[in-house]
C-alpha cells in the first residue's frame, strides 16, 4: 500500500466514529487506519478511479467506484465521520495520466462540492475531517460556514519549526463555538531532521 504523509496524518488525527466514509480513498490507507483505530466501526471508501478502488479492495477496504455527488443521493445524515485528503493541485500542470489527473485535481471534486455533499451525508452530530494545503484554510472555513459547518479542531502542520505551515488538518461539525475550538500545531521534524516526538506519538500505532 502506498503510504503518504498526508494520509497518515489524517488517519491518525481524525476523530473516531461508528459509521465512516473516506472520500477519495485511493489505496485505502486512511480507511484502513480508521478500521484499525475503530474496530467496531463500519468504514466505507469511495473513489472515481477504478484502479484505486480495486487496490483499496485488495487492502481490505469496503470500497466503491462512485462520485461523492452521487453517493447515497436519496439518503442523508448517515455518517458520523467523513474524512478526505482531497485533490489540491488546483493551479499545477495537469497530469498526462487521466486517472491520476482526476484523482489529484479539483476539477473532479471542488472544495465546495466536497463540503456541500459532506454536510448532506453527515448525521446531526457528525464531523468532517480534512487535510489541506495551509493556504487553503481560510477558503475552506468560509465555504464550510455556508453549509453550517464550523471548525472544532485545527492543527497546523510544519515540516520544521522555522518554516511556514505546509498543511492544515481541520475537523468540522454543526456546533458553532469559538470557546470550544481547539487550535494547535504539529512539527514533523526535530532539529536533527528525524521524526519529531509529537509526530511519532500521533502515529505510533501505525509506524514501526
Ranges and model annotations:
Residues 164-208:
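SAM/dcSAM-binding transferase cores
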Residues 18-26:
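Conserved class I S-adenosyl-L-methionine
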Residues 27-40:
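Conserved SAM-binding loop of SAM-dependent methyltransferases across substrates and taxa
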Residues 60-70:
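Conserved SAM-binding strand-loop segment of SAM-dependent methyltransferases
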Residues 86-113:
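Mobile active-site "lid"/loop adjacent to the S-adenosyl-L-methionine
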Residues 3, 109-165, 170:
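Conserved Class I SAM-dependent methyltransferase catalytic core
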Amino acid at each position: 500500500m502506498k503510504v503518504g504523509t498526508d494520509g497518515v496524518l489524517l488517519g491518525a488525527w481524525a476523530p473516531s466514529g461508528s459509521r465512516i466514509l473516506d472520500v477519495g480513498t485511493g489505496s485505502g490507507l486512511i480507511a484502513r487506519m480508521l478500521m484499525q483505530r475503530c474496530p467496531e466501526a463500519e468504514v466505507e471508501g469511495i473513489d472515481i478511479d477504478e484502479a484505486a478502488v480495486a487496490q483499496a479492495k485488495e487492502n481490505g477496504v469496503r470500497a466503491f467506484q462512485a462520485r461523492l455527488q452521487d453517493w447515497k443521493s436519496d439518503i442523508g445524515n448517515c455518517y458520523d465521520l467523513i474524512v478526505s485528503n482531497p485533490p489540491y493541485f488546483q493551479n499545477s500542470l495537469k497530469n498526462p495520466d487521466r486517472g491520476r489527473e482526476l484523482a489529484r485535481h479539483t476539477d473532479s471534486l471542488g472544495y465546495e462540492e466536497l463540503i456541500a455533499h459532506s454536510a448532506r451525508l453527515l448525521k446531526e452530530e457528525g464531523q468532517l475531517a480534512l487535510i489541506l494545503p495551509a493556504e487553503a484554510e481560510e477558503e475552506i472555513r468560509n465555504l464550510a460556514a455556508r453549509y453550517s459547518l464550523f471548525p472544532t479542531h485545527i492543527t497546523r502542520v510544519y515540516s520544521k519549526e522555522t518554516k511556514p505551515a505546509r498543511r492544515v488538518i481541520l475537523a468540522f461539525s454543526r456546533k458553532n463555538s469559538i470557546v470550544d475550538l481547539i487550535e494547535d500545531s504539529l512539527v514533523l521534524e526535530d532539529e536533527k531532521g528525524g521524526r519529531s516526538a509529537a509526530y511519532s506519538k500521533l502515529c505510533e500505532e501505525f509506524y514501526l
